[in-house]
Amino acid sequence: MAHDSKAAYNRFLLLVAGLGGLLYGVDVGIIAGALPYLEATSGLNAGQLSIVVAAVLLGSVISTLFAGTLADWMGRRLLMTISGLLFVISIPVIALSHGYQPLVLGRLLQGISAGLIGVVVPLYLAECLSASSRGKGTGIFQWLLTLGIVAAAVVGMYFSIRVEQVAKIGDAARLFAFKDTAWRSIFWVSLPPGALFVIGSVMVAESPRWLFRRGKRDAALAAL
């Protein structure tokens, strides 16, 4: 029974880590589907749109520099939770925005989230899984990262088809309104996996290696 329980927990851990990879992929790919409609309805110039696109990369570069230090300071699980919360917060900041600054802020938050996830989730997997399972964990993380990019593209494709259908009606005002709704909806769709990642991160145990390093031997043994 103990073996079955441990196996079930490891599957749950892999699921949570996989959701982290999915969010990373969504961070990278989501703007591609939203950009044409954002450009058509936001009134932003080319330079501003370029910054909105690049802000996620800037946020990722910055957070990656400090992710390891933060993971050592506050723990792997807490940093995973915070990274998920940053992603969740970024969605309404972007989707409800009506100006340049909120868009950039939301994209920066997404980038910071992605940078943290890209460091702390593989680190957490390496410290929590057995040597025989680490390759599987890394593979699942990378596979779902790629799936996140593909999923973002599929969502963008769906809305492009819907926009084409509305365009055939010939009502310019309706088309403009739908394009505005489309890019916001593309971001809203990515909210549920972010929320699931946060919930999962709260439910998993802290890394036993981190607990040992903090002198919390009993807690570390319980987490094994």
PLM features per residue range, with description:
Residues M1-L224:
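Transmembrane-helix signature of 12-pass secondary carriers
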